[in-house]
Amino acid sequence: MAQRLHLLLLLFLICFVNLISFSSQQDLSFIYNGFNQDQTNLNLDGSAKFLQDGLLQLTNATTQQKGHAFFNRPFEFGSASSQSPSFSTHFVCALVPKPGVDGGHGIAFVLSSSMDLTQADPTQYLGLFNISTNGSPSSHLLAIELDTVQSAEFDDRDKNHVGIDENSLQSVESASASYYSDKEGKNKSLKLLSGDPIQVWIDYEDTLLNVTLAPLKTQKPSKPLLSITINLTAIFPDRKAFIGFSAATGSLISYQYILGWSFSRNRALLQSLDISKLPTVPRPKKPEKTSPLLIVLLIILAIIVMVVVGGFYLYRRKKYAEVREPWEKPYGPLRYSYKSLYKATRGFNKDGRLGRGGFGEVYKGTLPILGDIAVKRLSHDAEQGMKQFVAEVVTMGSLQHKNLVPLLGYCRRKGELLLVSKYMEGGSVDQYLFHGDKPPLSWSQRVSILRDIASALCYLHTGASQVVLHRDIKASNVMLNGNLQGFLGDFGMARFDDHGSNLSATAAVGTIGYMALELTSTGTSTRTDVYAFGAFMLEVTCGRRPFDPAMPVEKRHLVKWVCECWREGSLVNAVDTRLRGKFVPGEVEMVLKLGLLCTSIIPEARPNMEQVVQYINRHQRLPEFSPNTPGIGVSTPVLMGLPSLAITSSSVTSSVSGPSASPSSANNSMFISHTIIYGDGR
């Protein structure tokens, strides 16, 4: 009897404890209509703080900051045998930019296994992860982000989006910020970084997660912005998580606030926020108004400047009118009027500037019949050699190959030459390799581009009526169309850049890292182009410039470093890390070895472009050679500055006779000069 009594008592205690536990889980419900009362249950860190008017400020106008605010009791899901977890939350936030600057980075509602996110980074990591924890299942974190900066590394769709992040900032679901208007029956865009309060509802039930947005005084829309199935218990095996907010700034800053917050395990029991009780969002002060007297003085000064500039413009227009000479009559169909090019480029507006290089600036334009074009403006003060140069430009325009950028014509003014070519909407290869505004190229795209340029260069060497040496093959001179097909461009500038003088075949011309050793002694030939193409192959495969003075000494010369990787039996380690291992190892090894063969310092050891085309298309196998073969993997002395050159860069200057060099703003490589030569250069 006593034993049975003990068992009943034990069973009662177990049921009582479970009931208390279940009750505590059911009781996790709260509401904050502003945060000026009962702040004890909220844990803040970083830049987060409560303001006197009841606002919860997560970040201020300081760079590289992060702020967190968590409810100090965990949201517990219960045992594995209990019902599936569910919750609903409603909060109002505001992201306020500083006047005159772009704001960032964003704010997120967070479920985390820990309130301690102090090891997370600000900027694009939003105070949620760092480089080592991002993407790790051990992070145990689910976030709904309101992101105002587009980060290419996380495949963000734009700089005004909402995303659902599961242990990673690469969202499993995202959409541009908007809300469904039940009145109009369609989605309406919503600017996150407007400074206006935004309502956010997050509902989770039966593994379905819904995220809904709306302006402040709008009822909850009937359709969510995001809806996705999420297994919350898989993210949080311990079946509990802390709930709260995270926000961050980087070099872009903004004030990020939470005005009110309501949470409940049961959507039906979720208390609605009282909009009338929410604090007002402060607006940063705008600069004080300029005094009327100063405005009048500025207007008078502007009028004077306009008169002076207008007079100077008329003077310049008369003095530098378009130049036409009798010998240009045969080229009439290829001659464009300056007025048409001026209108096509909207007056060479800086907004249409595509780039700036060692020879001049390139602008995008539109002609009625041809459509989009690229116009390159070149300054030139000498008339000597102009006739021969224009003749060469026209001849270059007659070259026909599918992978050459078509040269359409020219325009000539006193002191200026304008070259018109087809516009390539894909930009240049170096923009994909070295600039964050373009997505990384896949391996198949890179190989296809290399094959395109090899075909074009083979045509210049063997397919034209005369041998054409490009002499400046590099990533910034390889253009792409909308389908990412490669086109070799930016040729025909040599004689003009040398101020009309007759070019010597022994002149050392090109860009640092692409120049063959023999340029300063025996001069140019098709094999010097082969060397530059080999450097370009390595550049595209490795995602590194052929010569980078900022790298450690052992990695400064790409040719030497790739050969060293081969010597150590790890050739594929030289591949661009942005490929993330998605490449064909055998094909990569073939391309890298071919690049090393083309950059041999022994000209006779290099293949010609016909052979290169056969090798890169896998029609022939590469000849047998090793990293210890003479001439392979040797960095050329011209990169260090030979006595016959005068190379000027931000770090090296040599005041000796020879062609001068200047840094190219197009690709930050040291450019010496650039030519095309017709004749027997095979």
UniProtKB/Swiss-Prot annotation:
GO annotations of cellular component type: plasma membrane
Binding, ATP: 354-362, 376
* Regions crossing the membrane: 293-313
Under catalytic activity, the entry for this protein gives: L-seryl-[protein] + ATP = O-phospho-L-seryl-[protein] + ADP + H(+); L-threonyl-[protein] + ATP = O-phospho-L-threonyl-[protein] + ADP + H(+)
- GO annotation, biological process: defense response to fungus
Q: Which residues form the signal peptide?
A: 1-19
What region holds the Protein kinase domain? 348-622
Extracellular-side segments: 20-292
Gene3D superfamilies attached to this UniProt entry: 2.60.120.200, Phosphorylase Kinase, domain 1, Transferase(Phosphotransferase) domain 1
Q: Which UniProt keywords apply?
A: ATP-binding, Cell membrane, Glycoprotein, Kinase, Lectin, Membrane, Nucleotide-binding, Plant defense, Receptor, Serine/threonine-protein kinase, Signal, Transferase, Transmembrane, Transmembrane helix
Location in the cell reads: Cell membrane
Q: Which InterPro entries match?
A: ConA-like_dom_sf, Kinase-like_dom_sf, L-type_Lectin-RKs, Legume_lectin_dom, Prot_kinase_dom, Protein_kinase_ATP_BS, Ser-Thr/Tyr_kinase_cat_dom, Ser/Thr_kinase_AS
Q: Where is this region: Legume-lectin like?
A: 27-264
Would I find Cell inner membrane among this entry's keywords? no
Record: active site:
472
Topology class, membrane: Single-pass type I membrane protein
Q: Name one GO molecular function term.
A: protein serine/threonine kinase activity
Hey, which family's this protein in?
Answer: In the C-terminal section; belongs to the protein kinase superfamily. Ser/Thr protein kinase family. In the N-terminal section; belongs to the leguminous lectin family.
The entry's function note states: Involved in resistance response to the pathogenic fungus Alternaria brassicicola.
Q: What is this protein called?
A: Putative L-type lectin-domain containing receptor kinase I.1
Q: Which organism is it from?
A: Arabidopsis thaliana (Mouse-ear cress)
The top of its lineage is: Eukaryota, Viridiplantae, Streptophyta, Embryophyta, Tracheophyta
